[in-house]
Amino acid sequence: MPRAKGGFKSRQRRNKVLKLAKGYRGARSKLFRSATEAVDRALNYAFRDRRVKKRDFRSLWIMRINAASRLNGLSYSKFIFGLKKADVQIDRKVLADIAITDPKGFAEISAVAKAQL
């Protein structure tokens, strides 16, 4: 029985990695070993940054809410505390959107929060 070296499957596996590395600079898109390292690193960064993105957006929303609430005479922490006491259940994403698109509406929400303090 002749020896089977698994050439087809090996080539398939290499081509899969090289396809993922398409568009990388230099040897990283041409040579299997360099491509493997680059793809592994890229996938690790992608995995990590999908989680970091959530933190970054939340901090962006908080910055926007803080800036808008300070225009209405409240700090961020007092604004959020006032909303919690008033039982207003609007999340930070929506509050940040209102702060940018509808400043008058945000001023009304700030008035509700201020009344509870």
Curated annotation (Swiss-Prot):
Single GO cellular component term: ribonucleoprotein complex
GO molecular function list: rRNA binding; structural constituent of ribosome
Signal sequence extent: none
InterPro entries for the chain: Ribosomal_bL20, RIBOSOMAL_L20_CS, Ribosomal_protein_bL20_C
Keywords: Ribonucleoprotein, Ribosomal protein, RNA-binding, rRNA-binding
PROSITE patterns: RIBOSOMAL_L20
Pfam families according to UniProt: Ribosomal_L20 (PF00453)
One of the GO biological process terms: ribosomal large subunit assembly
Purpose: Binds directly to 23S ribosomal RNA and is necessary for the in vitro assembly process of the 50S ribosomal subunit. It is not involved in the protein synthesizing functions of that subunit.
Sequence similarity: Belongs to the bacterial ribosomal protein bL20 family.
Protein name as catalogued: Large ribosomal subunit protein bL20
Organism: Trichlorobacter lovleyi (strain ATCC BAA-1151 / DSM 17278 / SZ) (Geobacter lovleyi)
Gene name, Swiss-Prot/TrEMBL: rplT
